[in-house]
Amino acid sequence: GGVEYPFTPDTGAVPLVADMSSHLLSRPVDVARYGVIYGGAQKNMGPAGATVYLFDPERTGNTGRTLSPMLDLRNHGAKESMYNTPPVYAVYVSMLTMEWMKKMGGVAAMEKRNTAKADLLYGAIDRLAPVFKGTTAVEDRSVMNATFVLADTALEPAFDALWKEAGINGLRGHRSVGGYRASMYNALPIESVQVLVDVMEHFAKKNG
């Protein structure tokens, strides 16, 4: 986690397929450059249970093999996403979320908002070294998910107690990687990021 392509790779005639679950609707995307874009709604759009697919039928029709009808995107496109019973609740809440986004200024406004949050947190991670250390190369950092570790893992219990006391939830990183992961999806206000930064600054001052 914590890695994001800051550019769209040039794949020539080969259709580009992208899982945009984490940053779908977080910034403008030139969809014409992709053969397939897909993403789970549960990051920036709404609750779990819905998946978004954008695809070019001309570039995805020749699979070279037999597919289950449910896995053939052309069937869903031909039936206007009603090939089977849709997850009504997830779709409805996603609609409400997108109405909120529109009132906030749309995807361009989300990009500005998200960049400010990421700059705030990554700035703290870099400034508070060597107590904290980012796990991703600067040029590959994800705007949506910032990952970092403590240089001294023996201090993790003390840091965990501090951020939990501040009302922060789910900061622990993936169990296979360890460390910490701060998710900053569209709905998260910058004030919440500031709470984490304040906790980190307090901890670094005490343990640096």
Where are these regions (language model features)?
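Active-site C-terminal subdomain of aminotransferase-like
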Residues: 41-122, 137, 206-208
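Active-site phosphate-binding strand-loop segment of PLP-dependent enzymes
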Residues: 1-24
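PLP-dependent enzyme catalytic core of the Aspartate aminotransferase-like
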Residues: 165, 174-208
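Solvent-exposed alpha-helices and their adjacent loops that cap or buttress functional pockets
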Residues: 7-11, 28-32, 43-47, 138-139, ...
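Short beta-strand-to-loop capping motifs
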Residues: 55, 148-152, 184-186
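Conserved active-site segment immediately N-terminal to the catalytic lysine
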Residues: 17, 31-42
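Conserved PLP-binding catalytic core of the aspartate aminotransferase-like
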Residues: 131-162
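A short linear hydrophobic-aromatic micro-motif
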Residues: 131-135, 168-173
